[in-house]
């Protein structure tokens, strides 16, 4: 099964995210490419709603059906939608590749119809000591977003 998300946002930030899941309960490979970012790390999350009527703000909170605290992708305690950070170079471009065991393209952890968001700041992965660390990773504003949809095989 495959899915895709075309992300657009403020100040020329844009990207495309592709998801591939070989088996129903298998891990999901995530490949993303971005342009227009400031150099450095940017939080990257699946948010709960597929609603972008008010830009990225109407996408809701991180996708968290298991009601956990925010964490890193490799943590046992994390939101399903916590995918860590995208790292942009000095040219503003970034490539992200990861395989994740919590997100899915089907079932109760399905990300289909939800919104991908890239944030202005680094996600502290729940370890920053800020009041928002265990909620959002203190990643700041939402730079670009898009709704995840099924892709043609």
From Swiss-Prot:
Family the UniProt entry places it in: Belongs to the Cu-Zn superoxide dismutase family.
Catalytic activity: 2 superoxide + 2 H(+) = H2O2 + O2
EC number(s) from the headed UniProt entry: 1.15.1.1
Details of cofactor binding: Binds 1 copper ion per subunit. Binds 1 zinc ion per subunit.
Assigned GO CC terms: cytoplasm
Name this protein carries in UniProt: Superoxide dismutase [Cu-Zn]
GO molecular function: copper ion binding; superoxide dismutase activity
């Amino acid at each position: 099964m495959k899915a895709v998300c075309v992300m657009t946002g403020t100040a020329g930030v844009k990207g495309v995210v592709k998801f591939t899941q070989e088996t129903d309960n298998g891990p999901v490979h995530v490949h993303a490419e971005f342009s227009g970012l400031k150099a450095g790390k940017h939080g990257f999350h699946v948010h709960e709603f597929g609603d972008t009527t008010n830009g990225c703000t109407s996408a809701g909170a991180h996708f968290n059906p298991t009601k956990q605290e925010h964490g890193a992708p490799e943590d046992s305690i994390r939101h399903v939608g916590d995918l860590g950070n995208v790292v942009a170079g000095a040219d503003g471009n970034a490539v992200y590749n990861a395989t994740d065991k919590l997100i899915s393209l089907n079932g109760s952890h399905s990300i289909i119809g939800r919104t991908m968001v890239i944030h202005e700041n680094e996600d502290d992965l729940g370890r920053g000591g800020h009041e928002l660390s265990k909620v959002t990773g203190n990643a700041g504003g939402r730079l670009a977003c898009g709704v995840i949809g099924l892709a043609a095989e």
